[in-house]
């Protein structure tokens, strides 16, 4: 089984157990060791009649609006984000650790202000066209409520302005008939959930499960205030050592650091997702789902779907610039690993929150249809060779806000059932 191999991957697995345990302390060492062991106990517990009630494996309520188990079943309903009123986040330590140095002056100058008006206008138009095309493809589209993100707020621990509701993938995760609100890790995203509450309440009234992960205080202790990030080399060394700007003070995670493949969900420790956050998700979803920690050669890990994007049963896009340390284990499990071509986005195009690899941040409408950027001809040809039809949409200006098609959406309902692809 892949779980055994993936989470006991030779010396890397042993090193991870030792490192995570030492970082989190003795009280949490046990769960780390259990995570890196066989799933025999989990399999046995899943047969226990005590777990029979209220599990995701049970039939969904009739006409439940929420039902999605993976990234590729036929898409029926989706939430698409908004660029309206998007604000540049204040230049705090967690923002600095997640952005490229060439953009730091932009944040220092514009933190708390709206993103450039003309750019936002173009992004809004692109996303509207994306919504229209999704509707024409037979997909129901929902949108978050418009909010003025420039409003300053204060908690007992910090004060900030907001960011946006552009990326529902970052804050919402659908697992079966349950929609989970992530706690987030940026202070500018503390109240981002408010834009989605009217949609989620509607789903809840119609039979969906609704879970809100523990909200972090986002006190100073959650962040390494002296995190050294003067060069890419520094970031590589720190990431290799398992050191990130977020500490283990309290659970935090962005939903976009998890990617689903039926019963198996893969997560990465990143600048915004800590081990406590992953452990919260693991316990919450057990025993029906198995959460695996995987890692990459990535100097700035934040969100998994422009690094490792599962696009079909046994089919994954793996970023050649950020190779997965456990990739051989997927190969041994019989999966096909596809290396996407180099993106063609121009060097002078602003990418304030991301890299050019948003080209692989695609949205699958089903196993044979993919929404891809109209400018990215090389990856279009790659999909065509795989027998996947491309639906071409231009979201180049929307990319500047930090996401591609996968980031800009949260698939709420896909027509399919819960299956295991690794047993």
From Swiss-Prot:
Residues with PTM Phosphoserine: 46, 49
Annotated EC: 2.1.4.1
Record-linked CDD domains: amidinotransferase_AGAT-like
Modified residues (N6-acetyllysine): 385
GO BP field: creatine biosynthetic process; learning or memory; muscle atrophy; positive regulation of cold-induced thermogenesis
Active site residues according to the UniProt entry: 254, 303, 407
Top-tier EC class: transferase
GO molecular function: amidinotransferase activity; glycine amidinotransferase activity
Disrupted gene: phenotype observed: Knockout mice do not manifest aminoaciduria or glucosuria.
Record field: catalytic activity: L-arginine + glycine = guanidinoacetate + L-ornithine; 4-aminobutanoate + L-arginine = 4-guanidinobutanoate + L-ornithine; beta-alanine + L-arginine = 3-guanidinopropanoate + L-ornithine; taurine + L-arginine = taurocyamine + L-ornithine
Residue range covered by the transit peptide: 1-43
Cell membrane among keywords: no
SUPFAM superfamilies, alphabetized: Pentein
Tissue expression per record: Expressed in kidney, brain, gonads, uterus, and embryonic head, chest and abdomen. Maternally expressed in the placenta and yolk sac of embryos.
Record's function text: Transamidinase that catalyzes the transfer of the amidino group of L-arginine onto the amino moiety of acceptor metabolites such as glycine, beta-alanine, gamma-aminobutyric acid (GABA) and taurine yielding the corresponding guanidine derivatives. Catalyzes the rate-limiting step of creatine biosynthesis, namely the transfer of the amidino group from L-arginine to glycine to generate guanidinoacetate, which is then methylated by GAMT to form creatine. Provides creatine as a source for ATP generation in tissues with high energy demands, in particular skeletal muscle, heart and brain.
Protein name: Glycine amidinotransferase, mitochondrial
């Amino acid at each position: 089984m892949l779980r055994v191999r993936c989470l006991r991957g030779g010396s890397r697995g042993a090193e991870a157990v030792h490192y995570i345990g030492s970082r989190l302390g003795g009280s949490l060492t046990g769960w780390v060791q259990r995570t890196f062991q066989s799933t025999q106990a989990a399999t046995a517990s899943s047969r226990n009649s005590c777990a029979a009630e209220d599990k995701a494996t049970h039939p969904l309520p009739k006409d439940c609006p929420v039902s999605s188990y993976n990234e590729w079943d036929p898409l029926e309903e989706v939430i698409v984000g908004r660029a309206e009123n998007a604000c540049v986040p204040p230049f705090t330590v967690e923002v600095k650790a997640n952005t490229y140095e060439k953009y730091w002056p932009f944040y220092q100058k514009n933190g708390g202000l709206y993103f450039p008006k003309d750019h936002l206008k173009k992004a809004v138009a692109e996303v509207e066209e994306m919504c229209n095309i999704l509707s024409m493809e037979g997909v129901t589209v929902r949108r978050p409520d418009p909010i003025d993100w420039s409003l300053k707020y204060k908690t007992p621990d910090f004060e900030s302005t907001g960011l946006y509701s552009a990326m529902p993938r970052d804050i919402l995760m659908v697992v079966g008939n349950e929609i989970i609100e992530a706690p987030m890790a940026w202070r500018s995203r503390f109240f981002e959930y408010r834009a989605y509450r009217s949609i989620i309440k509607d789903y809840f009234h119609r039979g969906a499960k609704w879970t809100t992960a523990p909200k972090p205080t986002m006190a100073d202790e959650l962040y390494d205030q002296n995190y050294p990030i003067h060069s890419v080399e520094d970031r590589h060394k720190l990431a290799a050592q398992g050191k990130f700007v977020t500490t283990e003070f309290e659970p935090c995670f962005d939903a976009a650091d998890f990617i689903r493949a039926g019963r198996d969900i893969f997560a990465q420790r990143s600048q915004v997702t800590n081990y406590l956050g992953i452990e919260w998700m693991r316990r919450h979803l057990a025993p029906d789902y198995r959460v695996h920690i995987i890692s990459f050669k990535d100097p700035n890990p934040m969100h998994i779907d422009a690094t490792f994007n599962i696009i079909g049963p046994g089919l994954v896009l793996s970023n050649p610039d950020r190779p997965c340390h456990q990739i051989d284990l997927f190969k041994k499990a019989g999966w096909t690993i596809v290396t996407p071509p180099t993106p063609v986005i121009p060097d002078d195009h602003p990418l304030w929150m991301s890299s050019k690899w948003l080209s692989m941040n695609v949205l699958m409408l089903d196993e044979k249809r993919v929404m891809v950027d109209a400018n990215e001809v090389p990856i279009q040809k790659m999909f065509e060779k795989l027998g996947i039809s491309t639906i071409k949409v231009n979201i180049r200006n929307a990319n500047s806000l930090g996401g591609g098609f996968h980031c800009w959406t949260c698939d709420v309902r896909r027509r399919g059932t819960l299956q295991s692809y690794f047993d």
